[in-house]
Amino acid sequence: MFGSVRLVQEVTRSNQQTAANTTSPASVDESIIAQEPSNVSDLTSEPVESTQIKQQGNTEASQDIQQEQQQQQTHIHPQQPALSAQQTQQQPALPCWSTPTQHIPISFSAITSPSVLSSYKSRDFRNLFTTTNSSPNPSSPSPSSMKSHTRKNSKYTVRHHRTRQSSFNGTTNPPAYFSSNSILRKQPPTHHPQRNFLQLQQEQQKSKSQKLLCLWPLPTVTRYMILIALFVSTLNCLHILDLSCSAPSFVVYRFDIKNMILSPFLFNWTLPSMALFGWNVLILGLFEESLAHMVGGTRRFIQLLLVLFTTVSLVRVCLGLIFSKATGYAFPSLFFSNTMHECSQGLCVCCIF
């Protein structure tokens, strides 16, 4: 390729030299003819000769300029062909907004402060130090590198990478080893005296035994039951509501639904009734604390409580009706009495139990 380019350049140079040689004797002859004294009487030949001389001078000047440009291009780009050089000369200059621009490279060190750079350099140095110490020779691959356990909870990682804990009898195991970032580090031995371990066991047992009696803050359902019972009993005491304990005969024959629904929350403002009301609240709080987690939350416990309340109330009404019918023929005063269905003393849980 380079040889063909050189041949083309030599051919163009030889053509230019021959053209210059052919034009030079013609110009010399014309100049000699022009310099000879003419005694011609015609004055019209002088302006024609002067115009020919001017044209010849212009052509010679243009040829000289082209030769100089070609020589400069050959000196600057000796391996570039002449045709490509002429094409580049003929291309118009692009405007300033269409010229391609280069992005200025901005390094991380030019933006950040020297303190941050020093911390990054120290970290990189530390990582290099750890990798050089931890990485074995490339010629002899270690068996640990061949086994890749990607799962974090696999049996291998649990067995080989967990820290050994102290035994239950108070004796401590020898210092364990664990691997972190391919570096084996020695774990300092942990000495737990037997006294601390026994204290922890006693505290756990106490917390389990006292958890049932620790009802503060009160559970959610117990709070609402206390508020409803206090509200209903206060309105009944002030004679705003006329409530009484529900009797099955009135429920069946007179449709006394209001007393059947509100009588479980009703109690009298006497000392025995208030003591029974407190005992019922304690029972409900203990059951809610122990059963709410087993059932699936407070909402499920409320649903279960409503179902039990309705079913037990219906069962008690049916049993009371049968008992009053059975005993009413012997004791007529029991036909429309509420002796078998006393109030639940402020809580519907007594209907269930």
UniProtKB/Swiss-Prot annotation:
GO terms for molecular function: DNA binding; DNA-binding transcription factor activity. One of its GO terms (cellular component) is nucleus. It comes from the Eukaryota. Residues 148-164 have a biased composition (Basic residues). Residues 59-95, 133-145 have a biased composition (Low complexity). Residues 11-26, 36-58, 165-174 have a biased composition (Polar residues). It is found in: Nucleus. Residues 11-96, 129-174 are annotated as: Disordered. Its main location: nucleus. One of its GO terms (biological process) is regulation of DNA-templated transcription. Keywords: Activator, DNA-binding, Nucleus, Transcription, Transcription regulation. May be involved in transcriptional activation. This is Putative transcription factor MTF1. The lineage of its organism: Eukaryota, Fungi, Fungi incertae sedis, Mucoromycota, Mucoromycotina.
